[in-house]
């Protein structure tokens, strides 16, 4: 399958990337190759379409941007990889629920190969790691938008970041939800390494999905 993978400038402004995703999606045609954009954002809180302002508790000097993605509120910043997936789901023959599962399973697979056991949580999209006391902390978040069968936005995974800004919100709309990163799980790796691993895994899984459809499995 044809897939363009691009790294955006470090500290890319969320609003600029969002506008670029919308423009790409609006202009793409039936044969336009899918793309993956990888980046670390400058600090920003984003509110999804279902986002309630009361879940932004104390933004301090961090900007809050209302977005068209699904979900509630989250934080993006340095030390976190954001993977924007500009995929034609209609062309791939993929239902939204299967796409969400693909994103979650991609993060779980990459974390697993790094030695971190992660899991999905029923009713709460994203990827979680068990903490002492058997509580779950969120390590990866999802947010997607589908327009005319094409997806944009994607997933974020906390690599080695300052987690303090998550205390200024109810992450994903859940009061008291803990967050963690790969560094807190004892793993030292770069955002670039993790981003490339996620992109490679996404391409592999999307290709496998399309292959299973064409073979009638």
UniProtKB/Swiss-Prot annotation:
BP GO annotations: protein modification process
PROSITE patterns: BPL_LPL_CATALYTIC, LIPB
Annotated GO CC locations: cytoplasm
Keywords from the named record: Acyltransferase, Cytoplasm, Transferase
Localization annotation: Cytoplasm
Pfam annotation, one family: LplA-B_cat
Reactions catalysed, as given in the entry: octanoyl-[ACP] + L-lysyl-[protein] = N(6)-octanoyl-L-lysyl-[protein] + holo-[ACP] + H(+)
Domain of life according to the entry: Bacteria
Annotated CDD domains: LipB
Function comment: Catalyzes the transfer of endogenously produced octanoic acid from octanoyl-acyl-carrier-protein onto the lipoyl domains of lipoate-dependent enzymes. Lipoyl-ACP can also act as a substrate although octanoyl-ACP is likely to be the physiological substrate.
Extra remark: In the reaction, the free carboxyl group of octanoic acid is attached via an amide linkage to the epsilon-amino group of a specific lysine residue of lipoyl domains of lipoate-dependent enzymes.
Protein name per its UniProtKB record: Octanoyltransferase
Gene that specifies this protein: lipB
């Amino acid at each position: 399958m044809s897939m363009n993978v691009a790294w955006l400038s470090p500290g890319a402004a969320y609003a600029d990337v969002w506008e670029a995703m919308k423009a790409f999606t609006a202009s793409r045609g039936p044969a336009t190759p899918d793309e993956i954009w990888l980046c670390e954002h400058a600090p920003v809180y984003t509110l999804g379409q279902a986002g309630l302002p009361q879940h932004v508790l104390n933004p301090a000097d961090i900007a809050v941007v209302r977005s068209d993605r699904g979900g509630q509120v989250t934080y993006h910043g340095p030390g976190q990889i954001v993977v924007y997936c500009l995929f034609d789901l209609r062309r791939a023959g993929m239902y939204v629920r299967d796409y969400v599962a693909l994103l979650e399973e991609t993060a779980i697979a990459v974390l697993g190969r790094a030695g971190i056991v992660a899991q999905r949580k029923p009713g709460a999209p994203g990827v979680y790691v068990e903490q002492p006391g058997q509580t779950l902390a969120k390590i990866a978040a999802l947010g997607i938008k589908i327009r005319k069968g094409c997806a944009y936005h994607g997933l974020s995974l906390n690599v080695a970041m300052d987690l303090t800004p998550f205390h200024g919100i109810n992450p994903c709309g859940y009061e008291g939800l803990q967050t963690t990163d790969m560094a807190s799980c004892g793993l030292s790796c770069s955002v670039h390494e993790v981003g490339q691993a996620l992109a490679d895994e996404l391409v592999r899984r999307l290709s496998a999905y399309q292959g299973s459809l064409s073979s009638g499995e």
